[in-house]
Amino acid sequence: MDIERTLDAWLNDAEFAENVAFHQLKPARQAMFEPFPATIHPTLQKVLREKGITALYSHQAEAINRLYSGENVVISTGTSSGKSLCYSIPILNQQFLQPGATALLLFPTKALTNDQHKSFSEYAKALPVETIKPAIYDGDTPSHQRSAIRKSATILMTNPDMLHQGILPHHTNWARFFSKLRYVVIDETHIYRGVFGSHFANVVRRLKRICAFYGAYPQFIMTSATIGNPAELAQSLIEQGVHLIDQDGSPKGPAHLLVFNPPFVDEKLGIRKSSLDFGVTFTLKLIRAGHQSLVFARTRRTVEMLLTYLRNRLSNEERDLARGYRSGYLKTERREIEQGLKSGRLRAVFSTSALELG
C-alpha cells in the first residue's frame, strides 16, 4: 500500500483523526538542471555520466562555479538534494589540476564519514588518477594504519574532536598534508551553535593558523540544513566571507507533515496516553502497511525501550525487521543497521541523534 492510501485510511478513521493536531501537504517540486561547468575535467564528466549523473542541479553548478571563482560557499538546501556533489566534484577535479592536492572533510557522525568514504573510494577506482587516496582518520582507525594515512592520504575524512586532539597538536607529522591543503569541507554546519559552536570556531582558527604556517590558504565548503541564518553562522565559524547558496534545484516529491496528540486516557484530568506507546503503535501500523520508518528519541534508554515495546508486539518472523541505533553499538553493528536501512531490509529503526544528521 502506498503512503497516500495509508494516510487516507488513517485520516478517515474517526478515532485516529481526532488526535491529528496539524496536517500540511508540502507540494512536489520539479528539478532545475544545469550542464556540467567547463571547469570539470572531461574524464571526470565521463565517469559522472557512467554513474547516471548527466547534468547537475542548479545549486550544485552554482557552488562549483563559485568555488572556481575563489569564493567560500555554504550550501543550505533540503535533505537528499545532492549537497555532497558540491564538494566531491571540486575535490576530485583538483587532482587533475594539481595532483597530490589535499582536502579535509569534517563530519559530525561516523555514519556520514563512512558514506562519503565509500563514495570517494568508488571514484578512486573509476578515475585514472593515482593521487585520489581517500582515508578515514578517527577513533576507529587502527593504529597500524595511521602512519600510512599521514604519509599518503589526499582526501582525509575525520571529525572535529579528532582534528582538535589527534591532528592539529601533531601538525608536524602532517606537514605534507597541510602544505597542499586546497579545500576544507564542514558538513552539517548548523549543528555548530552555542558553546559547542564557539569551541569549534576556535578549532577552525587553529586549523587556519597551521595552514598558513605551511603556506596553504584553503577554501571552505560548508553544508547546512535549511536554517534562518546559514551565511551568518558560516561566516562566524571561519571568519571569512561566504557566499550563500540556498535555491534548491533538486526535485522533491510531495510530503505530508503531521503532528499528533496521543489520545486521552482521562479527558477531565487532561491525562493522555504515553507518547512512547503511541509512537510504537504508529510504527507497528507503518510496518504492517509495508512502509519503512525512522523514529528518533532523545536518549539511548528511550531507544532501547521503544525497540523492546515494538518487538513485544511483533511476531517472531517480524522481530528482525526492527533495530535500534545509538552510540555504544559496535562499529560492525552500526554499519549493518545503516545498510539495512538503505536496502529496505529493516522496516523500522529507533535512533538517537546519532543517525539524525545527513
Q: For each of these PLM feature ranges, what is it?
A:
Residues 1-61, 69-72, 132, 319:
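Helicase-associated low-complexity/disordered flanking segments
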Residues 84-85, 101-122, 225-230, 300-301:
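Conserved Walker A/P-loop ATP-binding site and its immediately adjacent core
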Residues 92-115, 129, 212-216:
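Conserved SF1/SF2 helicase motif Ia
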Residues 102-105, 109-113, 283-313:
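Conserved strand-helix element at the start of the C-terminal RecA-like helicase core
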Residues 112-136, 236-242, 314:
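Conserved helix-turn-beta segment of the N-terminal RecA-like "Helicase ATP-binding" lobe
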Residues 139-182, 340:
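Conserved helix/coil segment N-terminal to the catalytic DExD/H
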Residues 145, 329-352:
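Conserved helicase ATPase core of P-loop NTP-dependent helicases/translocases
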Residues 219-223, 227, 231-303:
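Conserved interdomain linker/interface between the two RecA-like ATPase lobes of SF2 helicase motors
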